A protein has these predicted regions:
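Loop-to-helix element that buttresses phosphate recognition and phosphoryl-transfer chemistry
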Residues: 5-62, 103-118
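Glycine-rich phosphate-binding loop signature in dinucleotide/nucleotide-binding domains
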Residues: 45-48, 124-131
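Domain-level recognition of soluble alpha/beta enzyme cores
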Residues: 150-173
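Short active-site segment of divalent metal-dependent hydrolases/proteases
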Residues: 13, 141-142
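Generic beta-sheet signal
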Residues: 5, 131-139
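Phosphate-coordination/substrate-recognition cap region in phosphate-metabolizing enzymes
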Residues: 38-104
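Short hydrophobic/aromatic-enriched beta-strand-loop microsegments
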Residues: 28, 72-79, 154-162
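Active-site signature of alpha/beta-hydrolase-fold catalytic machinery across serine-
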Residues: 66, 144, 148
Length: 173
């Protein structure tokens, strides 16, 4: 039996607008980001989900809270496994000022992110087999996560289109 996933990237944040490496920062939704979540709520009925699984970072949990609109979910797991790529010592810095030729050694590699996305996929397969699950997370993480679902090899993950803020994509595992 297939597990259906509604995969959503969090709403726009102040850090998105400022082109900041957010990584594991909590992030602050902009008014537009909140509005994006309200708009998504009109097209995604949260009552159809057996569970919600999200990153434990505030920008993701705030997006879920807006989508819920006061409803109490059956099951909501907030997990560090679904966090954005860890930018290490680049976290909080402006993207345009980073030296892409000499990334610090504490930055999570694409291989590490791909591996973590695989663990997240296994978690969902084990815990929610045959269920319908809302997954709310982050752009780069979700790119690797969806690549794992589609069985796209690591070398081709960059060719996967990333989700926009509060964009939803349905996939089955």
């Amino acid at each position: 039996m297939k597990t259906r996933l509604c995969i959503v990237r969090h709403g726009e944040t102040e850090e998105n607008i400022s082109h900041i490496f957010q990584g594991h920062l909590p992030g602050t939704l902009t008014e537009n980001g909140r509005s994006q979540a309200v708009t998504l709520r009109k097209t995604v009925d949260v009552s159809v989900f057996d569970a919600i699984v999200s990153s434990d970072l505030r920008r993701a949990t705030d997006t879920v809270t807006i989508l819920l609109d006061g409803k109490v979910p059956r099951d909501w797991v907030r997990s560090a496994l679904f966090r954005e790529k860890d930018w290490g010592s680049l976290t909080g810095q402006v993207v345009g000022k980073a030296d892409f030729d000499a990334f610090p050694s504490d930055v999570e590699t694409k291989e590490m992110l791909y591996d973590r996305a695989g663990k997240a996929l296994c978690f969902l397969q084990d815990k929610y087999a045959g269920k319908t699950v809302l997954v709310v997370s982050h752009g780069l993480f979700l790119q690797s996560f969806m690549a794992r679902i589609a069985r796209v090899p690591l070398e081709q993950v960059g060719s996967m289109r990333r989700l926009g803020n509060c964009e939803c994509r349905w996939m089955e595992i």
